[in-house]
Amino acid sequence: MKKKAIGHAGWLWTGLASIVAFIYFFPVLFIILTAFRSRMDTLATPPKWIFTPTFENFYHIFFRAMANSTEYVSTGFHVYFFNSIYISGMSVLLALLIGTLAAYGFSRHPLRGNDTYLFIILTTRMLPPIIVIVPIFLIFRITGLAGTYTGIILMYTAFNLPFSIWMMKSFFDELNTEIEDASRMDGASERSVFFGICIPQVKAGLAATSVFALILTWNEFLFSLLLTNKLTRTMPPAMARTIGGEINVDYGLLAA
C-alpha cells in the first residue's frame, strides 16, 4: 500500500513538473512557430496553429527587395553577425585580460584606500549609458574613433572592465594563499605564482566572467547604434533597422 502511494505521488510530481516545463517552454515554441509563419498568418487573430510553413522570413533576413523592382539585394546581415562575433570576442578578451590582472593586484597586493578604488571602479558601471553617451560620442568624433572597430572594441572593453574586476577579485579572494606563499619562499616569481598557481584555480571564474561579459556585449544596443556605421554595426541595431519601425513591426522576421 505504501509503495502504491509513493508511485501515485511520483506520477503527480512528474505531471506537475511537465506542466511547469511546458509553461516555460511555450514562449520559445511560439517564437519558433512564428518564424515559419507568413506575414498574414503572423498577424492573424486568433493565432493560427495549423498553417503552411514558409522559409521567407529566414530569406528576408539576408536579402531584401529593391524599391519598385523584383530584384533582391543583400541586407548585409552576415556582416553584422561577423561584427558582433569579432567585436564581442575582442572586447571580452581584453576586459578579461586587464580585469584579471587588476583583480589579482587588488586581491593580493592591496593599496591604501583599496576599497575606495574598488568603489570608484564600480560606480563607473552604475552610470546609465545614456548619461555618458554624449561626451563619449564627442570624444570619439574628435579622435576619429567613431565608426571604427578599434573605437567600439575599446568602448565595450571599458564597459565590461568594472564587472570583470569585481567578479575575478571575488574568485581570487576565495583561494588559499598558503600555496602561493610557499612558492614564493622557494624562489618563485610573482609571474610564476600568478600563471602557474592562481590562474589554474580560477578557470571557472574566467569562464563565468567571459560568458556574462559576452552576453552584455552581444546584447548592447545604444553604443553600437551611435558609435558605429554601416560597416561596423552589430546585430542589435541591425535587427532594429531590418525588422521594422515603431508601428510596423515584422514579427516573423523578429522571431527568425
Q: What does each of the following model-derived ranges do?
A:
Residues K2-A256:
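A structural signal for multi-pass alpha-helical bundles of membrane permease subunits
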